[in-house]
Design a protein with these regions (language model features):
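Surface-exposed cleft-lining segments at the edges of enzyme active sites
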Residues: 1-8
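His/Asp/Glu-rich mid-to-C-terminal helical/loop segments that flank catalytic regions of hydrolases
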Residues: 122-152
């Protein structure tokens, strides 16, 4: 209960305020919820243990949390950089994405799962040279999203 009161509630309250402020200021918002995932699905992580993951999994909860043009933009940027990308499989998006995604109100929320093999040795947890390339990819993605029109 302590962690919920001290961490969960304040975090979600701050995120709610940030999303609302961005939507008021810009007429819409594009929220990207980033996570890391192992190169291969673990026994308890998904319904598909042993499944090799692509470089990225985009989750829009089957199109309910972001407009198609926003999801397509993210996929296009990542594939243009040579990455493998899956949509909603095996991760559709978590509660934060559901809570903040409402495309009819120009509020787009996507979960972005990033394969750890892109930036670290999973066995040692040491970063490797791929982390610089990943940083550049993420910079390009953020720039593309900054120029996207959430109200389209």
């Amino acid at each position: 209960r302590w962690r919920i009161d001290r961490c969960w509630h304040p975090y979600h309250a701050a995120l709610d305020l940030a999303v609302e402020a961005a939507a008021r200021r810009h007429g819409g918002v594009i929220h990207l919820n980033c996570h890391s995932m192992p190169a291969v699905a673990g026994a308890c992580a998904t319904e598909h243990p042993g499944l090799p993951h692509p470089d990225f999994v985009i989750g829009d909860r089957d199109g309910t949390t972001a407009a198609p043009h926003v999801t397509a933009l993210v996929i296009d940027v990542l594939r243009t950089r040579g990455h493998s990308v899956a949509l909603n499989h095996p991760y559709k998006g978590v509660e934060i994405v559901r809570r903040h995604g409402d495309p009819a109100r120009h509020r787009h929320s996507l979960q972005l799962e990033i394969n750890r093999k892109l930036y670290m040795d999973e066995r040692t947890r040491e970063m490797h040279a791929g982390s610089a390339a990943l940083q550049q990819t993420l910079r390009e993605l953020v720039q593309a999203l900054l120029h996207a029109d959430p109200c389209r």
